[in-house]
Amino acid sequence: MLDPKFLRNELEVTAERLATRGFILDIAHLTQLEEKRKSLQVATEELQASRNAISKSIGQAKARGEDVDAIMAQVGDLGSQLDAKKIELAAVLEEVNAIAMSMPNLPDESAPIGADETENVEVRRWGTPRTFDFPIKDHIDLGEGLNGLDFKNAVKITGSRFIVMKGQVARLNRAIGQFMLDLHTTEHGYTEAYVPLLVNEASLLGTGQLPKFGEDLFHTKPATEEGQGLSLIPTAEVPLTNLVRDSIVDEDELPIKLTAHTACFRSEAGSYGKDTRGLIRQHQFDKVEMVQIVKPEDSMAALEALTGHAETVLQRLGLPYRTVILCTGDMGFGSSKTYDIEVWLPAQNTYREISSCSNMKDFQARRMQARYRVKADNKPALLHTLNGSGLAVGRTLVAILENYQNADGSITIPEVLRPYMGGLTKIG
């Protein structure tokens, strides 16, 4: 959520910056609402003051033995007018808030201006894609050949965009997640967290999935009243970031760095026809998430560090990748600046996204009322929040299967994963 004061005082600037994201702000309507809000606010305050003043005179009139019926009737009339104005004001404020909640974050000045992913800017590459001297197989053929990826039974059990993993492929998938968690907790300074996979509406509003992206979520509808309104998490960013919702954190506690390995659930609304085969785009997938909660002046440096932590995973696994900065038209709703990390997939002969690392600045914190107490003046101020995939486990499995494949269909295990695989150097 944007700063209301900045929005009111810099409406034209806000509209221009949001336009670079493809969001058209109706300045005339918002100005009209703001003028109406001011008018109703003044009228409400004046009616309140008049009623208070006349109410005080009732006691004085009674003390003088005067009839107060007329005064009481006047107070009642003012009260009715006041109630009506309050209802009008509440309606205007609700509409203003709805507009504010629908606005994406302002892009950072360092984010390149562009319309879509074709205008993202590459900032670096690591590793050299392997040259194969045999026909390359994709992860689907490799996984099925190892009897480790079972798409047929997943469709039978649930439907499309789900997977059953078995045997050494399932073990490799588990090893990938464990390696990522160990790396982030032992070397990168994150605290591991176990979080609910179901969250309430307030949590989804806080991180920005609601109200705009409800169709992307899986919502539960249990029979019990207690469970109403819960949704499966699309990312562990939601529960991890909401740990500071409605809180004031001591400055000495910052930065807060959290990581979690969870299943994630997405309806993939709007993705019809995209990546219909394989593990690239699933309704249920595992991801290791990183979240940082920091002071405002530290957030841009934290974004660089966070992105580096995700890149380190790929470097340790020996997987070639490139990092791009997203242009304004391709950034996520709540992001001010985002780096995407794309891993090399030989079977597709291209780089595909495996991590997205974003600085939300105070956008989520304002929605969540997540603050810290500044030592200098002992006053609360909004935090800055960041999040990034470290990494998407299923896509990492895809990258390992394809990049480490052998001519006979077996897969060489990356060295850093061998301790998690009981010392195995190869599967298949």
Swiss-Prot record:
<dbReference type="InterPro" id="IPR010978">
    <property type="entry name" value="tRNA-bd_arm"/>
</dbReference>
<dbReference type="InterPro" id="IPR002314">
    <property type="entry name" value="aa-tRNA-synt_IIb"/>
</dbReference>
<dbReference type="Pfam" id="PF00587">
    <property type="entry name" value="tRNA-synt_2b"/>
</dbReference>
<keyword id="KW-0547">Nucleotide-binding</keyword>
<comment type="pathway">
    <text>Aminoacyl-tRNA biosynthesis; selenocysteinyl-tRNA(Sec) biosynthesis; L-seryl-tRNA(Sec) from L-serine and tRNA(Sec): step 1/1.</text>
</comment>
<feature type="binding site">
    <location>
        <begin position="266"/>
        <end position="268"/>
    </location>
    <ligand>
        <name>ATP</name>
    </ligand>
</feature>
<dbReference type="GO" id="GO:0016260">
    <property type="term" value="P:selenocysteine biosynthetic process"/>
</dbReference>
<feature type="binding site">
    <location>
        <position position="289"/>
    </location>
    <ligand>
        <name>L-serine</name>
    </ligand>
</feature>
<dbReference type="Pfam" id="PF02403">
    <property type="entry name" value="Seryl_tRNA_N"/>
</dbReference>
<dbReference type="InterPro" id="IPR042103">
    <property type="entry name" value="SerRS_1_N_sf"/>
</dbReference>
<dbReference type="GO" id="GO:0004828">
    <property type="term" value="F:serine-tRNA ligase activity"/>
</dbReference>
<feature type="binding site">
    <location>
        <position position="389"/>
    </location>
    <ligand>
        <name>L-serine</name>
    </ligand>
</feature>
<protein>
    <recommendedName>
        <fullName>Serine--tRNA ligase</fullName>
        <ecNumber>6.1.1.11</ecNumber>
    </recommendedName>
</protein>
<dbReference type="InterPro" id="IPR033729">
    <property type="entry name" value="SerRS_core"/>
</dbReference>
<keyword id="KW-0963">Cytoplasm</keyword>
<dbReference type="GO" id="GO:0005524">
    <property type="term" value="F:ATP binding"/>
</dbReference>
<dbReference type="InterPro" id="IPR015866">
    <property type="entry name" value="Ser-tRNA-synth_1_N"/>
</dbReference>
<feature type="binding site">
    <location>
        <begin position="235"/>
        <end position="237"/>
    </location>
    <ligand>
        <name>L-serine</name>
    </ligand>
</feature>
<keyword id="KW-0436">Ligase</keyword>
<comment type="similarity">
    <text>Belongs to the class-II aminoacyl-tRNA synthetase family. Type-1 seryl-tRNA synthetase subfamily.</text>
</comment>
<dbReference type="InterPro" id="IPR006195">
    <property type="entry name" value="aa-tRNA-synth_II"/>
</dbReference>
<comment type="subunit">
    <text>Homodimer. The tRNA molecule binds across the dimer.</text>
</comment>
<keyword id="KW-0030">Aminoacyl-tRNA synthetase</keyword>
<keyword id="KW-0067">ATP-binding</keyword>
<dbReference type="GO" id="GO:0005737">
    <property type="term" value="C:cytoplasm"/>
</dbReference>
<feature type="binding site">
    <location>
        <begin position="353"/>
        <end position="356"/>
    </location>
    <ligand>
        <name>ATP</name>
    </ligand>
</feature>
<dbReference type="InterPro" id="IPR002317">
    <property type="entry name" value="Ser-tRNA-ligase_type_1"/>
</dbReference>
<keyword id="KW-0648">Protein biosynthesis</keyword>
<dbReference type="GO" id="GO:0006434">
    <property type="term" value="P:seryl-tRNA aminoacylation"/>
</dbReference>
<dbReference type="InterPro" id="IPR045864">
    <property type="entry name" value="aa-tRNA-synth_II/BPL/LPL"/>
</dbReference>
<comment type="function">
    <text>Catalyzes the attachment of serine to tRNA(Ser). Is also able to aminoacylate tRNA(Sec) with serine, to form the misacylated tRNA L-seryl-tRNA(Sec), which will be further converted into selenocysteinyl-tRNA(Sec).</text>
</comment>
